[in-house]
């Protein structure tokens, strides 16, 4: 295997520990890497049983659009079907080049949200929406895949986990959050939507009915310590 290192996609990403997964080099909204062991010359000796899937839109706090979700599902499904992968690390690249902010995922990109869901668009504004394609809410399919795949999915939260991003951390098997930068917020009340998928049901099961309602109804920010408690 080659000694060439992948691009450094995040300040907390060590290229020497990873390689890009073959066949997924065309991703634009996420990155997909396989953990590797290298020898003293930097040559890859073997693949390790961990993959890293990361949102790669730090300039918008790693918000997802339909294209992002398409790529996320492809990567997760590939990891599910790869027999020598045991663990999936789900995280967000960063920080933002604009302001240095960190995010795991801030949920759906509100700029391309319509009445029927989030729309495919050629750009980042409502004017670039493709009117020939229906809106999508298929992040719920990703939630279902995470809950049913026979792999351990760990959410690594190094910044904001908000809205749909908060729900992704909830459906993951484990969450490891930065004590300094990890922030959690369910923004449904702010943007006028509701996660009727696994996110709300599992949150109530994990933290109790009353606290889950507080998280959803009040849209309050919680730090990593409070969410741990």
Where are these regions (language model features)?
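Conserved CoA-thioester-binding segment of acyl-CoA-metabolizing enzymes
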Residues: 2-95
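Short, charged helix-to-loop "capping" segments that act as catalytic/coupling loops
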Residues: 47-48, 83, 89-107, 173-189
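Hydrophobic/aromatic residues within transmembrane alpha-helices
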Residues: 53, 90, 109, 168-169, ...
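Glycine- (often His-adjacent) and acidic-residue-rich active-site loop
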Residues: 60, 92-141, 192
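Glycine-rich acyl-CoA binding loop
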Residues: 61, 65, 135, 158, ...
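Short, flexible helix/strand-to-coil boundary loops that buttress conserved ligand/catalytic motifs
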Residues: 64-65, 108, 117, 188, ...
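Charged catalytic carboxylate motif
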Residues: 67-71, 138, 145
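Crotonase-fold acyl-CoA enzyme core
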Residues: 144-229
């Amino acid at each position: 295997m080659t000694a060439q290192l992948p691009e450094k996609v995040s300040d907390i990403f060590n290229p020497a520990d990873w390689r890009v997964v073959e066949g997924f080099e065309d991703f634009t909204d996420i990155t997909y890497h396989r953990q590797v062991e290298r020898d003293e010359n930097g040559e890859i000796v073997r693949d390790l049983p961990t993959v890293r899937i990361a949102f790669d839109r730090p300039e918008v706090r790693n918000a997802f659009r339909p294209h992002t979700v398409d790529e996320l599902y492809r990567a997760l499904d590939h990891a599910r079907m790869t027999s020598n992968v045991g663990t999936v690390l789900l995280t967000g690249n960063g920080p933002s080049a604009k302001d240095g902010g960190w995010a795991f995922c801030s949920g759906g990109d509100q700029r391309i949200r319509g009445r029927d869901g989030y729309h495919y668009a050629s750009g980042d504004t409502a004017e670039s929406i493709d009117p020939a394609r229906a809106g999508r809410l298929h992040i719920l399919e990703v939630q279902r895949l995470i809950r049913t795949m026979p792999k351990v999915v760990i959410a690594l939260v190094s910044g904001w986990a908000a809205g749909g991003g908060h729900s992704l951390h909830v459906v993951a098997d484990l969450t490891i959050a930065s004590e300094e930068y990890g922030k959690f917020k369910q923004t449904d009340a702010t943007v006028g939507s509701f996660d009727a998928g696994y996110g709300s049901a599992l949150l109530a099961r994990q933290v109790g009915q009353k606290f889950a309602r507080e998280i959803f109804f009040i849209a309050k920010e919680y730090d990593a310590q409070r969410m741990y408690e």
